[in-house]
């Protein structure tokens, strides 16, 4: 069983691997917007 304190951070751990993907996607969109302008 997980500790109660860890249960609070469980959603954060679920989101953590997605952050670099979102950052890469954001950078790609910015580059595309600047490139097409």
UniProtKB/Swiss-Prot annotation:
Chain coiled-coil ranges: none
Keyword RNA-binding: no
Biological process terms in GO annotation: photosynthesis
Membrane-spanning parts: 16-30
Subcellular location: Cellular thylakoid membrane
Membrane topology, Cytoplasmic segments: 31-37
Pfam families: PsbK
InterPro entries with a match to the protein in the record: PSII_PsbK, PSII_PsbK_sf
Stretches in topological domain Lumenal: 1-15
Membrane topology field: Single-pass membrane protein
Cofactor binding annotation: PSII binds multiple chlorophylls, carotenoids and specific lipids.
Keyword match Transmembrane helix: yes
Keywords, alphabetical: Membrane, Photosynthesis, Photosystem II, Reaction center, Thylakoid, Transmembrane, Transmembrane helix
GO cellular component: photosystem II reaction center; plasma membrane-derived thylakoid membrane
NCBIfam families per the UniProt record, alphabetical: PRK02553.1
Subunit structure: PSII is composed of 1 copy each of membrane proteins PsbA, PsbB, PsbC, PsbD, PsbE, PsbF, PsbH, PsbI, PsbJ, PsbK, PsbL, PsbM, PsbT, PsbX, PsbY, PsbZ, Psb30/Ycf12, peripheral proteins PsbO, CyanoQ (PsbQ), PsbU, PsbV and a large number of cofactors. It forms dimeric complexes.
Function field: One of the components of the core complex of photosystem II (PSII). PSII is a light-driven water:plastoquinone oxidoreductase that uses light energy to abstract electrons from H(2)O, generating O(2) and a proton gradient subsequently used for ATP formation. It consists of a core antenna complex that captures photons, and an electron transfer chain that converts photonic excitation into a charge separation.
Family: Belongs to the PsbK family.
Stated name of the protein: Photosystem II reaction center protein K
């Amino acid at each position: 069983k997980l500790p109660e304190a860890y249960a609070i951070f469980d959603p954060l751990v679920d989101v953590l691997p997605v952050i670099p993907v979102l950052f890469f996607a954001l950078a790609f969109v910015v580059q595309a917007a600047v490139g097409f302008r």
